[in-house]
């Protein structure tokens, strides 16, 4: 979480409020899609794995993992495809930010990668082994910070050099650097968002390396459940968890749908007030871009700092749930 904050705060210095608005718009769509497709996978896999091990059915735990990989890989691929297909429509007509489309497309691959990684993550956590998850989380955070900041800085730095040399930027000549900077912000934001997909891939690679080091020993002749039975159980148990995660993520999605529109209406209704109080920002990004600037400042900076402390509370689940599930399976309850 600290590395994540180190990523977003300097990123805000590069992209500014406007660029962070593009960045946050991509996350605004990604969060509910992730909630539906992948958010509940670690919890369900953790619980089922712990129960199978407690019941002395390691073979069934391994088969559940294999079935879950096939099922959720397909669901993740569908989620990635839908995000990519509807990215332009979402950016233009729902988020009212057409410039965010490249960033939305860049985050699409993360959906499928997260689904696969979540299965392996939950499987190991169900064996009360959180080291693979911790190593993957660190790999994700570090790679996201390095790749994201490098991409964003690289785009801005190259555009500045081309402007100073009098060269075209994105196929167009600009007489003023502020206009050139505004033009390359969507590309810089997309580069920063692409780091999310790259970081998820790095986390998955870390999990796969850890996965080879610890495998359950399956006794010969162990009876396992049918694949169809396991699939039904996975779907049945993930629905309430995914629904809960979706409700929590809907708050940020509702913000995405309403905050920018409300600010745009407010600027149009009383432009004199906003020019008087935010004249410098309007001079930089225009009256139409003020709403996106404010939204980016709210989600990209303020909420990043605010969420640091609450995020630690959710970590207790990682150690508590496998033990609770195993005790429940053994009927070892007071």
Task: Please identify what each model-predicted range represents.
Residues 78-102, 158:
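Short membrane-interface helical motifs at transmembrane helix boundaries
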Residues 39-54, 306, 310-330:
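Helix-loop junctions and terminal segments of transmembrane helices
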Residues 11-32, 99, 182-190, 229-237, ...:
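Interfacial/gating helices of multi-pass transporter permease domains
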Residues 163-193, 205-248:
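Interhelical loop/hinge segments that connect adjacent transmembrane helices in multipass membrane
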Residues 85, 96-120:
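Alpha-helical transmembrane segments of multi-pass membrane proteins
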Residues 1-43, 80, 240, 244-258:
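Signature of the first transmembrane helix
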Residues 135-184:
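Alpha-helical transmembrane segments of multi-pass membrane transporters
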Residues 114-137:
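Membrane-interface junctions at transmembrane-helix termini in multi-pass inner-membrane proteins
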